[in-house]
Amino acid sequence: METNSSAAFSPLPVPTTFIVNVIHAHPGKQEEAFAIIQDVVHYVAERKEGFLWSTLAKSTDGQTVVNIEAIQAAGNVNEFFSDPVFAEKFRKLDDVSKSEFHTYTVGDLVLPKRVAAL
């Protein structure tokens, strides 16, 4: 199912909710942890209306993976975890990592204040 992305830049703070997963991979398991959270995020992106966008990144020291994910509202978290397929996919992280999961709401957007030289 193809959909149009609703992701867009806004120069003002918008009441967006973010999920931040910090995944502390077991030694030598960063790539596997990345693949698991990538699978989870793609599953959500393809099926859940509350999903807006995600950025997945690996630390350069090989120890962590982070998922910064924008969702429409904090209630989407319960919606995602109530899906048994999602929950099973997410639990696979326990085999290769210890992870933290936090929900945030935007409080400020800081942009550069420098004036470009001509």
What are these regions (language model features)?
Residues 1-2, 118:
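Eukaryotic N-terminal targeting leaders
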Residues 2, 43-53, 70-105:
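An amphipathic, aromatic/His-enriched active-site/gating alpha helix that lines ligand/cofactor pockets
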Residues 4-11, 54-56:
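Short beta-strand/turn micro-motifs at beta-sheet edges
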Residues 8-20:
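An N-terminal domain-start capping segment
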Residues 17-24, 52-84, 116-117:
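Short, well-ordered beta-strand segments in beta-rich or mixed alpha/beta enzyme
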Residues 24-35:
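Short, surface-exposed ligand-recognition loops at beta-strand->loop->(often short) alpha-helix junctions
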Residues 37-41:
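Short amphipathic alpha-helical/adjacent loop interface patches that line ligand
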Residues 107-118:
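Short, low-order "capping/linker" segments at domain edges
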